[in-house]
């Protein structure tokens, strides 16, 4: 730790660290808290910030007030990002839960997002297994297992073959 950083108050150092973290990408409040509490890797090894619980709360409140930290924005962007990567709603819900987002906030954001999960599952399956999708049972099971692993719901997966038969 340099002499100039050791003289800065813990609140200022925490605030600087929070803004740097949030400048890279959106985080949930729980993620930001976890990263702020973690020791900083300095030139001479891990460095602790001598901050109180009140300092952490003030930093989180400041980030909320100035629009740097917004869980609803984080959830909307996270859903859009993960769906573009081919993940289904079940997997996205689980990941948001792990990031400390409440079930109510997740469900609200899932209802508000304009994503056709069935079409997304079909696109993902055709990218992996080519068009036309197989109708042989053993091949269908393989695709079904793949899509379930990616987090798609069984009803969306079954709709692929229902729509395919039409």
UniProtKB/Swiss-Prot annotation:
It holds the Pfam family RecX_HTH1. Gene3D superfamilies: Winged helix-like DNA-binding domain superfamily/Winged helix DNA-binding domain. GO terms for cellular component: cytoplasm. It is found in: Cytoplasm. One of its GO terms (biological process) is regulation of DNA repair. It comes from the Bacteria. Keywords: Cytoplasm. InterPro entries: RecX_HTH_1st, RecX_HTH_2nd, RecX_HTH_3rd, Regulatory_RecX, WH-like_DNA-bd_sf. PANTHER family: REGULATORY PROTEIN RECX FAMILY PROTEIN. Modulates RecA activity. Belongs to the RecX family. This is Regulatory protein RecX.
């Amino acid at each position: 730790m340099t002499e100039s950083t050791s003289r800065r108050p813990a609140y200022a150092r925490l605030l600087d660290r929070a803004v740097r973290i949030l400048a890279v990408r959106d985080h949930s409040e729980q993620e930001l808290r976890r990263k702020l509490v973690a020791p900083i890797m300095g030139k001479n090894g891990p460095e602790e910030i001598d901050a109180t619980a009140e300092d952490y709360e003030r930093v989180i409140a400041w980030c909320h007030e100035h629009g740097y930290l917004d869980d609803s924005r984080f959830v909307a962007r996270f859903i859009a990002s993960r769906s573009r990567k081919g993940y289904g709603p079940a997997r996205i819900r689980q990941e948001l839960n792990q990031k400390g987002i409440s079930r109510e906030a997740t469900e609200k954001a899932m209802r508000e997002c304009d994503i056709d999960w069935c079409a997304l599952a079909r696109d993902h399956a055709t990218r992996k297994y080519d068009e036309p999708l197989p109708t042989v049972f053993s091949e269908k099971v393989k695709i079904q297992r793949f899509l379930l692993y990616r987090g798609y719901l069984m009803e969306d997966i079954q709709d692929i073959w229902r729509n395919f038969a039409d």
